[in-house]
Regions:
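Glycine-rich nucleotide phosphate-binding loop and flanking beta-alpha elements
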Residues: 14-16, 40, 157-159
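Hydrophobic structural packing positions in well-ordered secondary structure
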Residues: 13-16, 35, 94, 151
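Catalytic core of DAGKc-family lipid kinases
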Residues: 25-147
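Conserved residues at the C-terminal ends of beta-strands
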Residues: 10, 74, 154
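Conserved residues at beta->alpha junctions
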Residues: 10-11, 85
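Short glycine-/acidic-enriched loop or helix-start segments at secondary-structure transitions
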Residues: 18-21, 43-44, 93, 162-163
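ATP/NTP phosphate-donor binding region
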Residues: 1-10, 17-25, 53-56, 64
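Internal anion-binding site segments
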Residues: 126, 137-141, 146-171
Length: 171
């Protein structure tokens, strides 16, 4: 239906990403966020409360909303929306490593989730190889690079559990 809907995400950046990618009609969605992930760069980038109860209070009682722009990546015949960042190469390999290894679970149980990013970064750094890449900007300008380790687009300043990769990013 065309009725407005509110969705509250309890999770981290991956949960926000999954919800955003799964939505069909973003113009009628209000998104609430309660940060319980390991990185929480979405909330950090929007200056939302990191405390779970304060975030819940904001979701339940705030009458203010704000619109944010989402990044959109077109890859062959696929479209991927993102709220925080999107990348290929080294940074994507780190995210993939976090998803398939037990390192993130281990560090999260110790309350040291940010160290998981550092551990996976070091692990992937030794295995990183450059590749050729072509970027097509707005379907008009093509840029070719011979040795690329990674390429990232940022919608928010932070990635990787609080690393300020793109300080001037504004959603």
């Amino acid at each position: 239906s065309g009725d407005p809907v509110t969705i509250v995400v309890l999770g981290g950046d991956g949960s926000v990403d999954e919800v955003i990618c799964g939505l069909q009609n973003l113009s009628r969605v209000t998104l609430g966020y309660i940060p319980i992930g390991s990185g929480n760069d979405f909330g950090r980038g929007l200056a939302l409360p990191s405390d779970t109860m304060k975030a819940l209070d904001l979701v339940l009682h705030s009458e203010q909303t704000r619109k944010i722009n989402l990044g959109v990546l077109h890859y062959h015949d696929k479209v991927h929306r993102f709220a925080v960042s999107s990348g290929i190469g080294y940074d994507a390999a780190i995210c993939h490593q976090l998803c398939i290894s037990r390192v993130k679970v281990f560090f999260n149980r110790l309350g040291l989730g940010k160290l998981a990013y550092a551990a996976c970064s070091l692990y992937r750094l030794r295995r990183c190889q450059p590749d050729e890449m072509e970027i097509l900007l707005d379907d008009t300008k093509s840029l070719h690079f011979k040795r690329v380790f990674f390429a990232s687009a940022f919608n928010l300043p932070y990635e990787g559990g609080g690393c300020k990769f793109c300080p001037d990013a504004k959603p």
